[in-house]
Amino acid sequence: AKLDSEPGPKESPVKAAIKGMGMLFVNISFWIILLYFATSSLPGWATKNWLPTLFSENLSIDMSEAGPLSTFTIAISSFIGVIAGGILSDKWIQRNVRGRIYTGSIGLALTIPALLLLGFGDSFAMIVGGGLCFGIGFGIFDANNMPILCQFVSPRYRATAYGIMNMTGVFAGAIITKLLGESTDAGNL
């Protein structure tokens, strides 16, 4: 049986892709979600890419210790955040259609004090605690991106929309990583 979301027999895949992107780019909700996702990618990629350097310099430990410490800190706390964020939003959406949006916002809100702790912390507990808080918050946020997208984008265009979101997030991450690297090399960070 043909799914409703499959292109018709006379519609080429290229035409279907162009039509799908056209449908997304006229959807104001998609643009808002894209901006929300791209903006949050800046601290997300910056933290994940620069955390080993931050740990090494601020905690005076070798990179051979800072790399695994930062990876475990972010990975374990993000896993906890994904599980907690998924459970919370699944329960909240049953009472309020905006539950997933609110849950994702709570996750992003947790990243703010985390970034302050990471940036201004002067002890092991503060800096690693900031990393843990960031991971939990970003995990909560990340667990809800696709479900939020599903609330605003037709099933027919969701894969394209999510692909564009991911591409935009990676581009934002590349830009911030380059800027932070240049700033570090210039002695401004």
Region roles according to the model:
Residues G22-I83, F138-M146, G173-T177:
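Extracytoplasmic gate region of multi-pass secondary transporters
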Residues A1-K19:
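Flexible cytoplasmic inter-helical loops of multi-pass small-molecule transporters
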Residues V82, F152-G187:
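A late C-terminal transmembrane helix in Major Facilitator Superfamily
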Residues D90-G107:
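Cytoplasmic membrane-interface "Motif A"-like loop-to-helix N-cap segments
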Residues F55-S56, L88-S89, I93, L180-N188:
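Interfacial helix-cap and linker-helix signal at transmembrane-aqueous boundaries
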Residues L108-D122:
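C-terminal ends and interior cores of transmembrane alpha-helices
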Residues D62-E65, G99-Y102, E182-L189:
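A membrane-interface helix-boundary motif in multi-pass transporters
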Residues F124-I140:
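Hydrophobic core of transmembrane alpha-helices in multi-pass small-molecule transporters
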